Curated annotation (Swiss-Prot):
It comes from the Bacteria. NCBIfam families: clpP, PRK00277.1, PRK12553.1. Cleaves peptides in various proteins in a process that requires ATP hydrolysis. Has a chymotrypsin-like activity. Plays a major role in the degradation of misfolded proteins. The gene is clpP. GO terms for cellular component: cytoplasm; endopeptidase Clp complex. Its main location: cytoplasm. This is ATP-dependent Clp protease proteolytic subunit. The lineage of its organism: Bacteria, Bacillati, Bacillota, Clostridia, Eubacteriales. The active site is at 99 (nucleophile), 124. It comes from Syntrophomonas wolfei subsp. wolfei (strain DSM 2245B / Goettingen). Its EC number is 3.4.21.92. PROSITE patterns: CLP_PROTEASE_HIS, CLP_PROTEASE_SER. GO terms for molecular function: ATP-dependent peptidase activity; ATPase binding; serine-type endopeptidase activity. Fourteen ClpP subunits assemble into 2 heptameric rings which stack back to back to give a disk-like structure with a central cavity, resembling the structure of eukaryotic proteasomes. It is found in: Cytoplasm.
Length: 200
């Protein structure tokens, strides 16, 4: 199913210029992650982050998230890039940040992680399904357990929660309101109006 991407027209000293809405947002250092996370989506987000860093390494970037989650490896590629680049990245949950979406929400610069009042956040353990020979299934099971351990450690570090609590809470789907996510440490503030972006 394809969606029509709105175009916006801007007046410049050279006349009119039209942009698709995402390109126009990018001009204001805003990246919108509004879908499930797979390799294609991750590559687009990473490319935008690297482009904005090259444009101005000292100016904040805003990453808006409305995502049900997705691939762990794709999400971790975004996470590593968020930590790698020099600009502070502010994360803002609009709608839903679930699974890897919640993980990326927590990955923003501490003090600059937000959610709108009616946003919903959900954390849980990695899921995976594999078929084949028993030894291959065992290899994949070990890999998923290693990923689970790694994700839990990072989430504990990002939220300030004890690792034991993260392990318990992610054992099943754990839903939170925006306020509960603030108390948990996934975000720093529930906001109703835009925050002013700043230099570092």
């Amino acid at each position: 199913m394809s969606y029509l991407v709105p175009m916006v027209v801007e007046q410049t000293n050279r006349g009119e210029r039209s942009y698709d809405i995402y390109s126009r947002l990018l001009k204001d250092r805003i990246i919108f992650l509004g879908s499930g996370i797979d390799d294609t989506v991750a590559n687009l987000v990473i490319a935008q982050l690297l482009f904005l860093e090259a444009e101005d390494p000292d100016k904040d970037i805003s990453l808006y998230i409305n995502s049900p989650g997705g691939s762990i490896t794709a999400g971790m590629a975004i996470y590593d890039t968020l930590q790698y680049i020099r600009p502070d990245v502010s994360t803002i949950c609009v709608g839903l940040a679930a699974s890897m979406g919640a993980f990326l929400l927590a990955a923003g610069k501490k003090g600059k992680r937000y959610a709108l009042p009616n946003a919903e956040i959900m954390i849980h353990q990695p899921a995976g399904g594999t078929q084949g020979q028993a030894t291959d299934i065992e290899i994949h099971a070990r890999r998923i357990m290693n990923m689970k351990e790694s994700l839990n450690k990072i989430l504990a570090e990002r939220t300030g929660q004890p690792l034991e609590r993260i392990q318990k809470d992610t054992d099943r789907d754990y839903f939170m309101t925006a306020q509960e996510a603030k108390e948990y440490g996934i975000i720093d503030e529930v906001i109703s109006h835009p925050k002013k972006t700043s230099k570092k």
